[in-house]
């Protein structure tokens, strides 16, 4: 159960800021927490400023096992505490106090505006390891729907066909270790920080927030089980998926120089590597603060190839763990449509500037399952209820 250890934290607005007379780091604040009088608080956060709305723990508030009380700090009494997201326990961000949008009323309980109270189910994946569809929350929801006879809610998706008249991205699969590669280019991206509830959900699932675009790809990987990668479009113009004849070194997003051999599949900008397929992107093409145009990748790669590459590189990632399980290639385009929908929801000024560029190296044959009720009845020795079982299979 998440969030149950937190109470009494409200929206507080900083009305005045004075430097502490004896400390370069501390500030003397007056906080409007929706009460009749302003509250005196001592705070050392670097981002304090007049007008900022933040998470304010009033006297009597509880954060874990700590109860907030009036406290003397460097000669002044602090009647509460301005909190970072890390101190509240909703992310690992302790760079400064939490920043809340101006439209929220002072004194509002944080739990009334954010999904802090939540229940997290931990599923042991030992029983799911050979079910790639269960490596995302939606797959688990599908199982629950089938078992309980409930309707599975569909994804909200963007209509990618609306962009069919736009230019295609210059992309080519040159190695069949990539089964399917789908990509889309989006520009006019203005938002850098993810919505609070998205950051909370990521944190509760064990992932840290990075920036909006990276967070959104991670969010959808957890939701759908389909890894994606966002490139800075300034660094990626001609996408080629291939291997190289000679070994070389490649610096990944974590800043590590890795030795790439001729068996490792790479995503390239022309002949320049920009990502290790199915494992991790490159540092030179990462999304940065001034990125306004991205090229979004959603693909499926040969599971054995990804597994062997992770062993050679001694580097296993959340993405590679999923690619190692033979992901469904039919999910790549759905994931892009979901990404664009959510991106538009929180950054409405974005503009899709390419059509969906989608290539198969090869396709699996379509499999149709026939349900023979009489055979199942004879085989199991019981009479099955057709409607119940068929609905479960359809789900």
Predicted regions and their residues:
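Phosphate-backbone binding interfaces of nucleic-acid-interacting proteins
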Residues: 1-161, 295, 312-313, 318, ...
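Conserved mixed alpha/beta core segments that line enzyme active sites in large multi-domain catalysts
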Residues: 13-34, 38-40, 217-284
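Glycine/proline-enriched, intrinsically flexible loops and inter-domain linkers
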Residues: 19, 27, 152-249
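Conserved phosphate/anionic-ligand binding catalytic regions in large, soluble enzymes, centered on
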Residues: 52, 129-146, 208-228, 271-289
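Mobile "lid/hinge" segments at catalytic clefts and subdomain interfaces of large enzymes
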Residues: 80, 270-364
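Short, hydrophobic beta-strand segments
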Residues: 118-127, 179-187, 318-326, 362-380
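Terminal amphipathic helices with adjacent charged low-complexity linkers/tails
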Residues: 152-169, 350-375
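Conserved small/polar residues in nucleotide/adenosyl-binding loops
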Residues: 388-395
């Amino acid at each position: 159960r998440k969030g149950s250890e937190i109470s009494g934290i409200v929206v507080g607005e900083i009305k005045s800021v004075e430097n502490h007379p004896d400390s370069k780091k501390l500030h003397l604040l007056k906080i409007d927490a929706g009460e009749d009088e302003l509250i005196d608080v001592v705070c050392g956060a670097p981002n304090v400023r007049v007008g900022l709305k933040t998470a304010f723990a009033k006297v009597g508030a509880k954060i874990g096992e700590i109860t907030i009380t009036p406290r003397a700090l460097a000669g002044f009494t602090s009647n509460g505490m301005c909190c970072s997201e890390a101190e509240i326990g909703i992310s690992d961000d302790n760079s400064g106090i939490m920043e809340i949008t101006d439209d929220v009323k002072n004194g509002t309980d944080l739990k009334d505006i954010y999904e802090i109270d939540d229940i997290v189910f931990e599923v042991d994946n030992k029983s799911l390891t050979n079910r790639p569809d269960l490596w995302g929350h939606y797959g688990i929801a599908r199982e629950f729907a089938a078992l309980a006879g409930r309707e599975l809610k569909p994804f909200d998706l963007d209509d990618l066909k609306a962009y069919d008249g736009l230019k295609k991205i210059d992309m080519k699969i040159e190695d069949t270790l990539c089964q399917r590669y789908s990509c889309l280019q989006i520009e006019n991206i203005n938002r850098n920080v993810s919505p609070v509830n998205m950051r909370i959900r990521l944190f509760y699932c064990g992932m840290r927030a990075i920036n909006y675009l990276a967070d959104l790809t991670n969010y959808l990987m957890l939701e759908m089980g389909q890894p994606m990668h966002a490139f800075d479009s300034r660094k990626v113009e001609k996408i080629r998926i291939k291997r190289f004849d000679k070994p070389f070194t490649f610096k990944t997003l974590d800043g590590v120089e890795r030795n790439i051999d001729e068996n490792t599949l790479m995503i390239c900008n022309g002949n320049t590597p920009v990502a290790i397929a199915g494992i991790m992107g490159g540092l030179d093409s990462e999304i940065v603060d001034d990125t306004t145009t991205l090229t979004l990748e959603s693909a499926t790669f040969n599971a054995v190839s990804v597994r062997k590459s992770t062993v050679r590189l001694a580097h296993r990632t959340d993405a590679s763990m999923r690619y190692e399980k033979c992901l469904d290639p039919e999910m790549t385009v759905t994931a892009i449509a979901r990404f664009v929908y959510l991106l538009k929801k929180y950054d409405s000024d974005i503009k899709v500037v390419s059509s969906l560029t989608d290539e198969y190296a090869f396709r699996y044959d379509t499999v149709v399952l026939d349900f023979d009720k009489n055979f199942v009845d004879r085989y199991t020795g019981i009479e099955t209820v057709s409607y119940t079982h068929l609905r479960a299979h359809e789900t």
